């Protein structure tokens, strides 16, 4: 398990409790440690311009006999929340999103209204595509229109997610 934070506060939540429970969405799972380190480098460069986030924590599971600290018990809960329904659809590329925020930083709508205006956990162009997939277009019908379709989000996306195309599809 790899955790990246902006303050290093997650490390304490991983080593102090006797039980460590990780809750992550399905798209956060990658096949190899090499894949994870590649994503970490891309994430830091796209989010903050750093080579690597200062606060990156690797957790290998429960404490072993030779370990000085760490949890006695370790559990991983993978959330779907509608994500597998995106597989095989025009929105499947959205599952590659690493939540770096590059699309938000370059979106003129996001710059004008901020993140809270989206009304959900995910904001900006990526949120305007992902949220309707997770909660349905009836409830999130306004989000795909929160874009000028200028394409800046796709230009800066390190995962090359075609956000404008997906926003047009929702519209």
For each of these PLM feature ranges, what is it?
Residues 34-37, 101, 164-168:
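Predominant activation on well-ordered alpha-helical scaffold segments within soluble catalytic domains
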């Amino acid at each position: 398990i790899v955790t990246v934070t902006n303050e290093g506060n997650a490390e304490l939540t991983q080593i102090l409790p006797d039980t460590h429970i990780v809750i992550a969405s399905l798209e956060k799972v990658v096949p190899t440690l090499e894949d994870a380190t590649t994503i970490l480098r891309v994430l830091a460069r796209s989010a903050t311009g750093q080579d690597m986030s200062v606060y990156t924590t690797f957790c290998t599971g429960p404490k072993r006999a030779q370990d000085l600290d760490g949890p006695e018990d370790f559990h991983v809960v993978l959330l779907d929340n509608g994500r597998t329904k995106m597989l095989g659809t025009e929105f499947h590329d959205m599952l590659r999103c690493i939540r770096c925020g590059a699309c938000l930083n370059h979106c003129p709508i996001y710059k004008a209204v901020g993140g809270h205006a989206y009304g959900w956990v995910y904001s900006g162009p990526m949120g305007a595509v992902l949220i309707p997939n997770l909660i349905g277009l009836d409830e999130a019908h306004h989000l795909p229109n929160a874009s000028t379709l200028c394409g800046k989000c796709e230009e800066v996306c390190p995962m090359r997610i075609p956000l404008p195309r997906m926003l047009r599809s929702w519209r």
